Amino acid sequence: MSVESFTPTALQFTQGAAHKVKSLVDEEGNDRLKLRVFVTGGGCSGFQYGFTFDEDVAEDDTIVEREGVSLVVDPMSFQYLAGAEVDYQEGLEGSRFVIKNPNATTTCGCGSSFSI
């Protein structure tokens, strides 16, 4: 019998996203806030991304730190986000956090819905 260990693929947190999180945290005046990224069922492609700020971190959450701020992902969402990149973009459509997910087989035009 053999036992294989599993090492999850890292979640990337870009410098642009980290700077925006830091700016928003500073604006709120609460350095305990972290950006929580999650996946829920729904959207036009089956799953959708969500973002919120959270002070709490569960024992089994994955934490990615950059530029003195933290991105937090729960274990259920991490399985869909392993290897993805969380970025912040500003453009004609407005400003928003975006996820570039290599696991997604299809994505919606809005960028917040995907399928695997």
Curated annotation (Swiss-Prot):
PROSITE patterns: HESB. Keywords: Iron, Iron-sulfur, Metal-binding. One of its GO terms (biological process) is iron-sulfur cluster assembly. Gene3D superfamilies: HesB-like domain. InterPro entries: FeS_biogenesis, FeS_cluster_insertion, FeS_cluster_insertion_CS, FeS_cluster_insertion_RrpA, HesB-like_dom_sf. It holds the Pfam family Fe-S_biosyn. Binds 1 iron-sulfur cluster per subunit. The keyword Metal-binding applies. GO terms for cellular component: cytosol. Its cofactor is iron-sulfur cluster. The keyword Iron applies. Iron-sulfur cluster binds at residues 44, 108, 110. One of its GO terms (molecular function) is 4 iron, 4 sulfur cluster binding. Required for insertion of 4Fe-4S clusters for at least IspG. PANTHER family: IRON-SULFUR CLUSTER ASSEMBLY 2 HOMOLOG, MITOCHONDRIAL. Belongs to the HesB/IscA family. Homodimer. This is Iron-sulfur cluster insertion protein ErpA. It comes from Pseudomonas fluorescens (strain Pf0-1). The gene is erpA.
